[in-house]
């Protein structure tokens, strides 16, 4: 499908040619950007699916797995029950989740946006009360949806997905002051320092005030539409900078009356943040995206560690408060703050420090452990109880604010450590806190001396109160009367243990398959290396030189056969550093080291342990990946590290992932050891009626945690429907059925165990040869190619590449129409006449730009077909007895380019640039004019003779192809043609790929039509490809 230009009859004048040139330049610009203009009457609606009685609008033709996923979401919402939904990355789960949830919500009543409320039967007027006066609850009687993800980076991607849908609920995204503050006076502060400074400036009685906060009421009054369209953190910050209101307090006011709230996890799992939310929790819907780490996050949010260094800092701050308060009382007669309260606080902290130092620790490795309720005994000896704790917390918070005000006055940016003591006490003495103490353990650990510690020369101890049942957090949430809690991720399995850990009943569960075909994935267990030495990274074997040498040699060979990006995941930083050091320093006479051999094949990048260095490592990876002088990049990373968590290594960024071992947690770690003991105790105390298989023992948890980390790492490859890659398990323990059963469901059927290393390399090489011919390198934008932009954990933007309307979407249509409307802003050199509108078309002096209709009209004899230049142009000639143009090569200079490279004319953009001429559609040599103008056609079907026939027209066939294929499939088709033209793949492989692409009852005419462009001698082979493919479709089912 393309753009068609029709001019009035008669010879064009020079002025008309210049006007046309402007139009063509715009059309070419839009074509290059991928915009297609649709006429208003032909705008197709999004596909509409009726799922459990709910009409769900989906922006694409949904795969069967996506429909099943949306069905489970709606079932959970309708039945007010909880759900565990696993769907591999690249299957479009975020978009499915949004569309299904919002369709269900819309079925209950209109959204709270001005547009929907005006169109609904619910009374609404512009004089609604301000948000600050409205009750929480997402528009009153309707349930509020809270969509939570781990980071704002992930939420940014979710909001992008929302923009792709047709749903426009009233929404808000919540963020911290650090992300939203636009007050230059304080936004350089961090943490509690920024919070206290903000609260101080927003006090009405304060001498200094925040102007952004003061502008908030007027802005909300005159902009009630805010949140009607999807807005992100960056959008809110720009509003604050441009219009003046405080973005942070915009979100605080707005979240009280919206349909859906987007927020990081801590707004739900932290009791303090939950209290901040003014939401009617009754029947609300809570969605946890990327929930594979939810149990550990819940446990961490309910635990604390108090190292002696931090406690000493708090004591120093308390002493500072005593001195400042006494000085203010003496010099200013200010008696509002009593220094004696701060002296009492200091005394209690000193006693706590002494109490911790006297705890008996027989063995440093084991530490001191007591049941959870012991924390109340310790604090009771300091007279800190449920009765006295509130007053003490008030004193701590008063000291922190007082100290912050002083630091503001002296321009000191350091935050107060005392706030941590307040948070610790709130956690211990929270509502019903003692009832939960049984799932805690008190632990005091003696740490090795650190030369940077304030307590240098003294014993450093840490008091910990660890929660071993993350379910207490989820139970607190569920007891608020929420309707449904939906947990989704690409790696939730095994689900039984997850449900048991979270202490909730999840009657709805789903383990979705991937949308890719099985031939797009290679998965194998490599038990031995090139020389036959067993690959096993267990604790006993990991430091053996022979193992490191064998693993290094294996990676060298993988680097040789895996194209582009290769990801290597180690169980720990220790093992990664140990192996790399060995490979660099090994003694090799008259030969290169293992590291040198790896570097010769691929440029290395190593994941840093310091998270602050991670962005630089990603930039390094991106630059090396884009360097065409290299054969690829190898990224050495760690399971549970940043590389394994949510990064998008799509296409060439990650063609294979190597798992070098099982990432078991350190068995001697006190927290791991106590967690295993806790689960074993709980299993023994469990109801004897429960089947033992459903009980989670310590060893089961230990093994499953390692399996989840593996599944997260291998999820970095295969990021969308048309991606392909390999997963290589380099540890013989993966041969065990017990280990393979923990691998994600969609991978398991593909896993093959190899006993000989040579077979691995030959199979891998064959796999990549086949897939590179089946999936030629797709055209990627600069943004897609920049891996640094994917530092954020994201769902691939190509989760579902099957658009409902050709290769465009409504957003692109709007942009293209805006571009057309601005055409008069780009006048030609001789000032052409302004644009005229004729229905859905655009005119300029008789030149008509037709909106896209799905057909390519005939070009009238005498039309000028030219690109960006009027200096070189030729007429498209027509013989007297035909309508089809006889096209000649037009050498056209693009005036927009600096080097004025020659380009094809518009007709070749619509036809020959598709590379169809490489498949039998080729340029014929120039023949004498006496042989007739028809014989001078540049596009002729081989063996068909009738180049003038409509069926053989490249433009007509291209139009049919574009109409039936989705965007990604069409790109593949173009890629095949381009690869064939460059002789990168063989004709036989192209025919097989085309048959696979065109297979399907609705595409049979494409299979037959393409045969016209196949050289005669290859047609029998092409027909055999068709027969073979159809037999496979009958036996195995059509993959398309």
From Swiss-Prot:
The keyword Isomerase applies. GO terms for molecular function: 4 iron, 4 sulfur cluster binding; ATP binding; ATP hydrolysis activity; DNA binding; DNA helicase activity; metal ion binding. InterPro entries: ATP-dep_Helicase_C, DinG/Rad3-like, Helic_SF1/SF2_ATP-bd_DinG/Rad3, Helicase-like_DEXD_c2, Helicase_ATP-bd, HHD_RTEL1, P-loop_NTPase, PAH_sf. A motif (PIP-box) lies at residues 992-999. It catalyses: ATP + H2O = ADP + phosphate + H(+). One of its GO terms (biological process) is maintenance of rDNA. Residues 52-355 form the Helicase ATP-binding domain. GO terms for cellular component: mitochondrion; nucleus. Keywords: 4Fe-4S, ATP-binding, DNA damage, DNA repair, DNA replication, DNA-binding, Helicase, Hydrolase, Iron, Iron-sulfur, Isomerase, Metal-binding, Nucleotide-binding, Nucleus. Its main location: nucleus. Disruption phenotype: Increased homologous recombination and replication defects. Growth inhibition due to defective cell proliferation. Hypersensitivity to DNA cross-link agents. Loss of 45S rDNA repeats. It is an enzyme of class 5 (isomerase). It is found in: Nucleus. ATP binds at residues 87-94. It comes from the Eukaryota. [4Fe-4S] cluster binds at residues 181, 202, 210, 246. Its EC number is 5.6.2.-. A motif (DEAH box) lies at residues 289-292. SMART domains: DEXDc, DEXDc2, HELICc2. Residues 930-939 have a biased composition (Polar residues). Belongs to the helicase family. RAD3/XPD subfamily. PANTHER family: DNA REPAIR DEAD HELICASE RAD3/XP-D SUBFAMILY MEMBER (PTHR11472), REGULATOR OF TELOMERE ELONGATION HELICASE 1 (PTHR11472:SF34). The PIP-box (PCNA interacting peptide) motif mediates the interaction with PCNA and localization to replication foci. A probable ATP-dependent DNA helicase implicated in DNA replication, DNA repair and the maintenance of genomic stability. Acts as an anti-recombinase to counteract toxic recombination and limit crossover during meiosis. Regulates meiotic recombination and crossover homeostasis by physically dissociating strand invasion events and thereby promotes noncrossover repair by meiotic synthesis dependent strand annealing (SDSA) as well as disassembly of D loop recombination intermediates. Also plays a role in preserving the stability of 45S rDNA repeats. This is Regulator of telomere elongation helicase 1 homolog. The gene is RTEL1.
């Amino acid at each position: 499908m393309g753009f068609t230009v029709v001019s009035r009859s008669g010879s064009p004048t020079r002025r008309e040619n210049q006007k046309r040139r402007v139009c063509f330049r715009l059309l070419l610009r839009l074509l290059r950007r991928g915009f297609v203009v649709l006429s208003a009457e032909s705008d197709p609606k999004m596909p509409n699916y009726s799922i459990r009685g709910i009409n769900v609008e989906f922006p694409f033709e949904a795969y069967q797995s996506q429909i099943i996923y949306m069905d489970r979401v709606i079932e959970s919402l309708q039945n007010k029950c909880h759900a565990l939904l696993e769907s591999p990355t690249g299957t479009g789960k975020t978009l499915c989740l949004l569309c299904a949830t919002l369709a269900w919500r819309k079925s209950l009543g209109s959204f709270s946006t001005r547009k929907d409320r005006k169109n609904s039967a619910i009374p609404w007027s512009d004089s609604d009360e301000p948000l600050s006066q409205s009750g929480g609850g997402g528009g009153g009687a309707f349930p509020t949806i809270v969509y939570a993800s781990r980071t704002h980076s992930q939420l940014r991607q979710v909001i992008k997905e929302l923009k792709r849908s047709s749903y426009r609920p009233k929404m808000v995204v919540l963020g911290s002051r650090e992300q939203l503050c636009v007050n230059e006076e304080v936004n350089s502060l961090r943490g509690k320092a920024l919070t206290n400074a903000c609260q101080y400036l927003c006090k009405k009685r304060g001498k200094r005030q925040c102007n952004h906060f003061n502008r908030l009421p007027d802005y909300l009054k005159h902009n009630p539409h805010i949140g009607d369209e999807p807005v992100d953190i960056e959008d809110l910050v720009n509003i604050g900078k441009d219009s003046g209101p405080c973005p942070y307090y915009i979100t605080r006011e707005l979240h009280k009356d919206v349909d859906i709230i987007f927020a990081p996890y801590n707004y739900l799992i932290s009791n303090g943040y939950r209290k901040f939310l003014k939401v009617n929790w009754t029947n609300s819907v809570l969605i946890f995206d990327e929930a594979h780490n939810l149990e550990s996050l819940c446990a961490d949010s309910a635990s604390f560690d108090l190292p002696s260094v931090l406690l000493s800092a708090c004591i120093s701050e308390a002493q500072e408060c005593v001195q400042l308060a006494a000085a203010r009382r003496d010099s200013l007669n200010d008696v509002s703050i009593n220094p004696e309260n701060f002296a009492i606080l200091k005394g209690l902290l000193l006693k706590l420090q002494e109490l911790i130092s006297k705890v008996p620790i027989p063995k440093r490795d084991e530490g001191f452990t007591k049941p959870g309720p012991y924390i109340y005994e310790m604090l009771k000896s300091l007279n800190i109880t449920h009765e006295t704790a509130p007053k003490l917390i008030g004193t701590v918070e008063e000291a922190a604010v007082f100290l912050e005000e002083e630091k503001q006055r002296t321009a000191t940016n350091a935050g107060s450590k005392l706030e941590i003591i307040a948070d610790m006490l709130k956690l211990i003495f929270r509502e019903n806190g003692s009832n939960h103490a049984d799932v805690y353990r008190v632990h005091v650990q003696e740490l090795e001396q650190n030369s940077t510690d304030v307590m240098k020369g003294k014993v450093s101890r840490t008091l910990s109160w660890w929660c071993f049942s993350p379910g207490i957090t989820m139970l607190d949430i569920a007891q608020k009367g929420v309707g449904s809690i939906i947990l989704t991720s690409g790696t939730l399995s095994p689900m039984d243990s997850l449900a048991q850990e979270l202490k909730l009943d999840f009657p709805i569960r789903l383990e979705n398959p991937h949308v890719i075909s099985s031939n797009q994935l290679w998965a194998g267990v490599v038990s031995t290396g090139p020389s036959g030495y067993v690959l096993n990274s267990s604790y006993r074997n990991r430091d053996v030189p022979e193992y490191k040498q064998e693993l290094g040699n294996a990676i060298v060979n993988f680097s040789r056969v895996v194209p582009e990006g290769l990801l290597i995941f180690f169980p720990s930083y220790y093992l990664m550093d140990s192996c790399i050091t060995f490979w660099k320093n090994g003694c090799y006479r008259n030969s290169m080291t293992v590291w040198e051999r790896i570097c010769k094949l691929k440029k290395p990048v190593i994941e840093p342990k310091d998270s602050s260095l991670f962005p630089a490592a990603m930039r390094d990876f991106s630059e090396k990946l884009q360097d065409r002088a290299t054969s690829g990049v190898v990224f050495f990373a760690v399971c549970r590290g940043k590389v394994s968590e949510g990064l998008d290594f799509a296409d060439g960024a990650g063609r294979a992932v190597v798992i070098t071992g099982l990432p078991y947690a350190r068995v001697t770690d006190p927290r791991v050891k106590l967690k295993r003991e806790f689960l074993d105790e709980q299993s023994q105390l469990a109801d004897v009626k429960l089947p033992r298989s459903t009980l989670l023992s310590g060893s089961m948890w230990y093994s499953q945690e390692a399996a989840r980390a593996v599944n997260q790492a291998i999820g970095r490859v295969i990021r969308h429907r048309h991606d392909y890659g390999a997963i290589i398990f380099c540890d013989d323990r993966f041969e065990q059925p017990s280990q393979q059963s923990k691998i994600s469901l969609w991978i398991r059927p593909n896993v093959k165990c190899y006993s000989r290393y040579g077979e691995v390399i030959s199979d891998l090489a064959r796999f990549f040869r086949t897939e590179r011919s089946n999936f030629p390198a797709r055209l990627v934008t600069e943004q897609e190619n920049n891996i640094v932009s994917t530092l954020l954990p994201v769902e691939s933007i190509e989760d579902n590449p099957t658009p409902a309307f050709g290769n465009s979407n409504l957003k692109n249509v709007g942009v293209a129409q805006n571009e057309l409307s601005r055409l008069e802003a780009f006048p030609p050199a001789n000032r052409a006449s302004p644009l005229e509108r004729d229905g859905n078309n655009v005119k300029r002096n008789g030149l008509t730009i037709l909106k896209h209709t799905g057909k390519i009209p005939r070009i009238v004899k005498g039309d000028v077909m030219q690109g960006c230049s009027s200096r070189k142009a030729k007429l498209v000639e027509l013989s007297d007895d035909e309508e089809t143009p006889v096209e000649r090569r037009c050498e056209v200079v693009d005036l927009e380019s600096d080097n004025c490279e020659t380009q094809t004319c518009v007709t070749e953009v619509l036809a020959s640039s598709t590379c169809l001429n490489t498949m039998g559609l080729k340029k014929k040599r120039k023949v004498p004019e006496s042989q007739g103008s028809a014989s001078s056609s540049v596009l002729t079907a081989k063996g068909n003779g009738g180049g003038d026939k409509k069926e053989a027209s490249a433009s007509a066939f291209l139009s049919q192809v574009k109409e039936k294929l989705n965007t990604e499939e069409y790109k593949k088709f173009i890629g095949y043609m381009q690869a064939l033209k460059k002789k990168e793949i063989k004709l036989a492989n192209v025919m097989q790929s085309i048959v696979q692409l065109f297979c399907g009852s609705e595409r049979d005419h494409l299979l037959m039509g393409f045969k016209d462009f196949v050289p005669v001698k290859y047609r029998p082979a092409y027909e055999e490809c068709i027969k073979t493919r159809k037999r496979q479709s009958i036996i195995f089912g059509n993959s398309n």
